[in-house]
Amino acid sequence: MKDCVFLVADKNMEATFRGFLEREKFHLSLGVGPFDFDVIVDSGGNDPGVYNYGHELLMPYQKTHRYAVVVLDQAWEGAPASHEIEQDIMANLTASGWTATDCTVIVIVPELEAWIWQDSPHLETAFQFNRAKLDVGMRDWLKENGLWPEDAVKPP
């Protein structure tokens, strides 16, 4: 039996989770022992699908995994509040056979992409953005060049 299955809403989340969890000795960053896992993606690749059907997608994994983690963004048209999303999914998971101690829900507010696009020198390094040469941060440069709308939490 494997330790954990992660159900994520889309390919971007899958890449993020795999990028972290597939690093050598990743568990040390979490302060836990090593564990094995699977990452699965909602077939529709969206947050509402995980919200509505995540418990169904995870039912077969009750026999093969000890724990389940559901991860989705809170940002979609008509989305309930994050605490309601968490409560609803947990209720569905427990009704479908998971115990409350063996599963959890992570609701990312506002959404994963907004967290990734935070104003950070690490992001600038990843994009090989030369702040010193341009005398401006990457976020400001994108805004000045019309690539990041003023009221947006991330570029389109």
What is the predicted role of each segment?
Residues 44-50:
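Acidic-and-aromatic substrate-binding clefts and catalytic sites of carbohydrate-active enzymes
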Residues 1-3, 14-41, 53-156:
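C-terminal accessory helical subdomains adjacent to catalytic cores in phosphodiester-
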Residues 6:
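Conserved SAM-binding loop
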Residues 9-10:
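Helix N-cap/beta->alpha junction signal
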